[in-house]
Amino acid sequence: MEKALRLLPLASRLFSLLGMIVLIGLMPWLSGRDPALSLLRARSGEQEATPEALNAIRQQYGLDDGPLLLLGRWFHGVLRGDAGNSWISGRPVLEGMLQATGVSLTLMGYALAVAVVVAILLALPTLWRGLHGENRRPAGVLAVSLTALPEFLLAALLLIVGAVWLQWFPPYGWQSLQHAILPALALGLPAGGLLALLLNDGLAATFSERWLLTWNLAGIARRHCLLAVLRRTLPALLPQVGLVLIGLTGGAIAVEKVFAIPGLGRATLGAAIAQDLPALQCGILILLLLAFGTGFLMQGAHYLLLGRIAAALPNSTPPQHSSRASYIFAAVAALLLCLLVLSGIIRDPFSSLHIRLQPPSLDLPFGADATGRDILARVAYGALNTSLLALAVSFASLSLGIVFGLMPRLMCGIIELANATPPIVAGLLVTAVTGPSPFGAACAVMLVSWAPLSAHCASLLAEARTQPYIRMLPVLGIGRCRTLTHYLLPALWVPLLRHAMLRLPGIALALAALGFLGLGPQPPSAEWGLVLAEGMPYIERAPWGVLAPAVALVLLAVLAVTLANTAGNRRR
């Protein structure tokens, strides 16, 4: 029995990976639509779907053989390097996707270089203070500010400033190194801010350990102390660095769309919108392989550097600092968002009552969009719609997190799979099944948002079961079911609910990202990401159409990151 329990996590990981492969392979049938009809519509939206045309497509692609047989053929073809032919062009999809992957990997390499430089620069003050005996975890205002900017939003802002206003960089394309600067900054700056927060935490924790005080009293040179501190800190950060790199795979999709880069993310997004399922299958499979491969390499490097002593190393806690500034930032951001909603909620977000692309004025504070609609009203209603949808996703994620958190060994594979899947990649999967819609976007974000809550639930459950009064319950004749419902769950509910509410702004940002990419609500809906996307084609003539939703998203992002940072300090 004990041996079977030890093998349960491995079996969970294998079945989760197998389930993901089956899900990708069965995508043409999961939507409930006739695959032949989907293929016909992907090729030509005007051709009449006659029985003869549909039968010809079924015979050409062997669709009458059924999903299971075609799943086996698809998987066998993937193993042989044949991912099928595009439903639109009829050409093999693998070669084009591999070329696009090369472009995306190049962009991610540039972004990683930017992130490393930013993280080092922001961590230098912590290193300097620690080596000189002043050890405190910095507030990290600049790092928090960088982390607060989602990649798709930062890409739009950089496009406005660097390409439109200053005209220092080309706005679109991938022809030279100059074309890579703005996209690399859009991807690298948020990742660098997050790495800086992690590195500062790790360094502050290492500087608080007693062995370093002993070294200082022994007169060991500072350069040797510096090398020892880095050797102690960096290996423990590798798993977190892996999660940052996984995040780059999702962020690259939005950045490639903004700057028209012919990368894997843009190609996969185009396949999802066009319902070119063979290309979408291949793109998602490569994206997931990149994410899983990155996580596996980081975990492997962590084990190689530390070996069996990894589990024996103490988990140091960085010294706490006053988070008054974080509370002020969060309060100001929340207040400005409330003022924005209250000032625009009384306006009409759908009527085209104004001049097309009318500039801002006293009567029209944020101007009008390309169809003459009030942007302030659309941003205010977008805040309301996005927040309500994010609230529903948060409660659904909380419910799933509790259910799966009660079975940590059985669900460890699914939890790791959800953690390794960016929300945008999940959005591509769901869009292939349901099509672009608010419900599909909510499902996509929910499918990856429950995993941190589940891990938190499992940790709280293990801690609660060690309490003496819980261990005495079986002696008193109280069964497992009553123990769970009357003692364990009430102890878990409050901290998990607080955790879920702290994740609410981040979920809203994920929903906005899917809306920006065209995977969420469709026009004429008032949704933040959609409003931002509608203003992008007119960014040179009417930049206020992008700046207005961008400012609202920046406020939401600042609120999300400062709340998470403050909560992290409080838990320590």
Q: What kind of region is each of these model predictions?
A:
Residues 21-39, 240-269, 428-429, 433, ...:
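Non-cytoplasmic
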Residues 176-216, 436-485, 495-504:
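Membrane-cytosol interface at the C-terminal ends of specific transmembrane alpha-helices
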Residues 281-322, 408, 445-448, 502, ...:
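C-terminal transmembrane helix and the adjacent membrane-cytosol boundary/short C-terminal tail
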Residues 15-23, 223-255, 384-400, 481-513:
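Transmembrane alpha-helices
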Residues 17-66, 167-179, 342-370, 522:
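Hydrophobic alpha-helical transmembrane segments of membrane transport/permease proteins
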Residues 1-5, 25, 87-91, 109-144, ...:
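Transmembrane-helix boundary motif in ABC transporter permease subunits
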